[in-house]
């Protein structure tokens, strides 16, 4: 009897488990087949990040270094052309030579080969010593330093009244000169007093007085002119160009020679009078 009861209990437990499993399967949410096919067919996106590679292209500093290196570098024995025009270390034209003959001459005289003119036909090369190449490179660097730097010109501004005292005007002139030496443009505005009648000529004389303190380095970039309905005057000073500096030095030297010549003429006349 006990055995029968145990069997009945086991069968009842199995039936309960089967019923629960069927109910769960019936109420479970099934995925949409369309969504499954869409997700399966959608490719994965690759995210690409742009990386800046190491290159001197577009880099002005890299280009300048490359140009300097190409402008005067030892070619060595890697001569791409078969026939080239050759100059010796003194600049004398040796004529057209085969590259094999050039290499033999280099080895014999212990010289280097430098490319001089690639646009000519055939290209022009020169035999040089190591010291000559070094001196030429130094000369190129000095020429690059002497070239004016490109970029916007900075302008300094100075404003003061027309009744400025001489001491203050000297101080302003020194400040302007310091700016001019640094290659700045200097805009100077002089305001006229309302209670005093002052002509444009008097204001212009102040500008000229400032300029006379530095005639060897400065000139007018914009000459004095009336502004603000005549209540002020303005001008712009700038540094002399190389050509203007040279012309100024030549004029000063010419004046000095004329002065010496006049002094010599005066002395000779005085000596003639004494002799008589």
From Swiss-Prot:
InterPro entries the record matches: T_IF-3_C_sf, T_IF-3_N_sf, Translation_initiation_fac_3, Translation_initiation_fac_3_C, Translation_initiation_fac_3_N
Domain of life: Eukaryota
Cellular compartments per GO CC: mitochondrion
Prosegment location in residue numbers: 32-94
Keywords, sorted A to Z: Initiation factor, Mitochondrion, Protein biosynthesis, Transit peptide
GO molecular function, one term: translation initiation factor activity
Subcellular localization, as worded in the UniProt entry: Mitochondrion
Tagged with keyword Protein biosynthesis: yes
GO biological process, one term: ribosome disassembly
Record-linked SUPFAM superfamilies: Translation initiation factor IF3, C-terminal domain, Translation initiation factor IF3, N-terminal domain
Presequence extent in this chain: 1-31
Disordered: region residues: 244-276
Function: IF-3 binds to the 28S ribosomal subunit and shifts the equilibrium between 55S ribosomes and their 39S and 28S subunits in favor of the free subunits, thus enhancing the availability of 28S subunits on which protein synthesis initiation begins.
Family: Belongs to the IF-3 family.
Name of the protein in question: Translation initiation factor IF-3, mitochondrial
Gene: Mtif3
């Amino acid at each position: 009897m006990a055995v029968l009861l145990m069997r009945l209990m086991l069968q009842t437990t199995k039936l309960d488990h089967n019923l629960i499993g069927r109910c769960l399967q019936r109420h479970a949410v099934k995925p949409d087949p369309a969504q499954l096919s869409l997700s399966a067919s959608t490719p994965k996106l690759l995210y690409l990040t742009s990386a800046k590679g190491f290159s001197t292209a577009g880099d002005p500093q890299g280009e300048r270094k490359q140009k300097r290196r190409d402008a005067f570098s030892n070619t060595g024995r890697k001569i791409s052309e078969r026939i080239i025009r050759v100059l010796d270390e003194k600049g004398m034209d040796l004529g057209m030579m085969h590259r094999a003959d050039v290499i033999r001459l280099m080895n014999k005289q212990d010289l280097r080969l430098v490319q001089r003119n690639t646009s000519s036909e055939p290209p022009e090369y020169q035999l040089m010593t190591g010291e000559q190449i070094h001196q030429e490179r130094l000369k190129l660097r000095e020429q690059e330093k002497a070239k004016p730097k490109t970029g916007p010109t900075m302008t300094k501004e100075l404003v003061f009244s027309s009744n400025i005292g001489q001491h203050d005007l000297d101080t302003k002139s020194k400040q302007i000169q310091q700016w001019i030496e640094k290659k700045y443009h200097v805009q100077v505005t002089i305001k006229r007093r309302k209670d005093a009648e002052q002509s444009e000529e008097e204001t212009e004389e102040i500008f000229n007085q400032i300029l006379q303190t530095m005639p060897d380095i400065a000139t007018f970039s914009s000459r004095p002119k009336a502004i603000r309905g005549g209540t002020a005057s303005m001008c712009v000073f700038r540094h002399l160009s190389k050509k203007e500096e040279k012309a100024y030095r030549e004029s000063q030297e010419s004046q000095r020679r004329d002065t010496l010549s006049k002094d010599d003429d005066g002395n000779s006349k005085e000596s003639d009078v004494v002799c008589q």
